[in-house]
A protein has these predicted regions:
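A structural signal for multi-pass alpha-helical bundles of membrane permease subunits
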Residues: 1-255
């Protein structure tokens, strides 16, 4: 993908994919970067708040299920299991099944073609994902810590902010990374909810390089490479935190 971005369109089409270019050219990368600068900014504006809000609210939801599951009331525990099952099922609902009613809702709210509208739509899908992932990390926190804090008169919000969230921080970072990657690569939601070219996200903008009356293959390879910069950077610089989160999940034991 990187190599073919340095080729001319004819060479990218006719030469083997892994063959080095006969003459290096930055024309494709420069042209594509100028075209994708705005979509890249749009994606960052949408993805960053989506990931943080989804992970944070998902963590709060996971803590709510955690406290219900350890309640002295058998009814509360049953309700917790039922709600958690519904949240888990929600993560398997395909985007296509809900985009029509979701689009109607966003149009009626007057937020179509806005950052708020696309963030709102993504939150609907990624908050359940955040709750599902964070529940696995919060469930290994010793129950005795929560009970001791409650005996001292600490409220649930303070327990969550001062005890639960810090102890589950590896899981929070792992969830954050996962949602960033998923929302960055999301294609269907921005394709349906954004109609103005100036508001396009990078996932939709890259698709515009194919089809039509022809395909400039060197530009397509360059666009795919530029669009992958953010996910690659996250894995390079934050990948170790993702691994730590998985290790913490595998090594933790509830009390």
């Amino acid at each position: 993908m990187i190599i073919n971005g340095f080729k001319s369109n004819l060479e990218a089409l006719s030469s083997p994919v892994l063959s080095p270019p006969r003459s290096f050219s930055l024309t494709a990368y420069i042209t594509v970067f100028n075209d994708l600068a705005k979509p890249l900014i749009n994606s960052l504006i949408v993805v960053i708040p989506t990931a943080f809000i989804s992970a944070f609210l998902g963590a709060m939801g996971a803590y709510f299920f955690y406290t219900l599951s350890y309640s002295f009331s058998k009814f509360s525990s049953t309700i917790s299991d039922l709600l958690f099952s519904l949240i888990a099922l929600a993560t398997f609902i395909p985007y296509q099944a809900t985009l029509i009613p979701l689009t109607r809702l966003i149009v009626s709210m007057g937020i179509l073609d806005t950052y708020i509208g696309i963030i709102f739509a993504m939150l609907i899908f990624y908050i359940p994902t955040g709750a599902l992932l964070m529940s696995m990390f919060i469930s290994v926190i010793p129950r005795s810590l929560i009970e001791a804090a409650k005996i001292d008169g600490t409220g649930d919000l303070k327990i969550f902010m001062k005890i639960v969230l810090p102890l589950s921080m590896p899981g929070f970072i792992s969830t954050l990374i996962f949602i960033i990657i998923q929302s960055w690569n999301n294609f269907f939601i921005p394709l349906i909810l954004i109609t103005t070219p100036n508001m396009r996200l990078v996932s939709v903008a890259v698709q515009s390089y194919t089809g039509g009356y022809g395909t400039l293959y060197n530009d397509t390879f360059a666009a795919a490479m530029i669009a992958s910069i953010v996910p690659l950077a996250i894995f390079i610089f934050l990948g170790r935190y993702f691994i730590r989160g998985l290790i913490a999940l595998g090594g933790g034991k509830g009390v």
